[in-house]
Amino acid sequence: MAAAITVEADFEGASVSAVEIDQTTRIISFMPGGDPARGWPCWWYFKVKGITPGEVVKLRLRGSTATTLVPGGPLAKPLASSWAMPEMATFSTDGKNWLHTEKGVKDGEVMTYTIKVDASSVFVAWGPPYTPSTAEAFVEAMSEKSHHANATELCRSREGRAVPMLHVQEGERTKAQRFGVWVQARQHAWESGSSWVAQGFGEWLLSDDADAAWLRQHAEIFFVPIMDIDNTATGNGGKDAQPQDHNRDWSPQPHWNEVIAAQKQVSGLIQEGRMDVFLDLHNPAPGDPTFFYILESSALKEPMIGLRDRFIELAYGRISKIKPLIPMSNKPKTTGPAYHPLWRQFSANWVSMNGNPHTVSLCLETIWNYKNSTTEGYRAVGANLAAAVREFLAERPVRP
């Protein structure tokens, strides 16, 4: 007789609710977990135990029915199920190497994924998880690999967690002689792919590539793989979290410690006249390719507009040529007054409006609902984005 299948979700980043297990058919029915007051309940991640190696187990996913109690506010009605339903689920038998399932089968509001592994347990998730522990291990590994990198903390979160950050520079140039580069991911906790993009950026930056060495020698780079550390750790979605999410919090009085700390450091670069490139990494809507969000040009002045467009041209020229393909649009989407009432408090917009005349500040949205939206695909995007930063800055006047 087959062992009973069980579901565990008592570990970092896990999230699941409404679990029902049919031991006869080996079908696990579930919904994403998460407190809707702490963001969109579309992220799911849990461990299945009691599997007979080689048997077929099915995951039957329904969208969350959770709502918030704020009249007219976010999630006054349930979130569309498509946000929780990638075409392919992600799984791992060791919690380190993540693979896609075959395409799920959608029937109305239910998506069914099939899992078959040669193991007695398996982790399953919306996408490849990237937890606070992953971020900490990565920045520590990069610091140990290279004496040009220093693993540090951006701050401590409101719940007391460390927010890992990597600081990178090489050589004897003074700070005043260096370009300033700020890269951050995961202001929305459910967008796990953005952290893998960030990791790819960091891996390239500290590689033996001559262009990477040039960037280290000519710039000071700050790198934060997870901004919304608390919601990432607790398996909450983060997007539209109350009182506002991290990417609606770049105001004169931010709520979140991570935003307070990032804003302070970015403001320092601005005051020094060297906030050259600011990149905020996200994942988009289910049907979107990779693309940049920009602040509408009417809110900007030259040379910022021309420099922004040049950077996008260089990044598109690299990312769109990645093999296997990562679909990317060369037409950015715009934000501004018509997009969201808090548009001024989006991080990339805040940096654009408060930055130096030459600042390039962008949000990159990397496709997640695609066959090549894997840890390898995401990291390739990050590496090519970093190479585009180097190419762009090499065109800029050398800082005296």
Task: Describe the role of every protein-language-model region.
Residues 1-118, 122:
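Extreme N-terminal flexible tails
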Residues 68-75, 134-137, 175-177:
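A short, polar/proline- and glycine-enriched secondary-structure boundary/capping micro-motif
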Residues 69-70, 125, 132-135, 191-193, ...:
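Short helix/loop capping segments that flank catalytic or ligand/cofactor-binding pockets
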Residues 103-159:
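Extended acidic/polar, glycine-enriched regions
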Residues 150-170, 175-337, 341-357, 361-365:
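Active-site/substrate-binding loop(s) of hydrolase catalytic cores
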Residues 286-289, 370-374:
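Short active-site-adjacent structural elements
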Residues 371-400:
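His/Asp/Glu-rich mid-to-C-terminal helical/loop segments that flank catalytic regions of hydrolases
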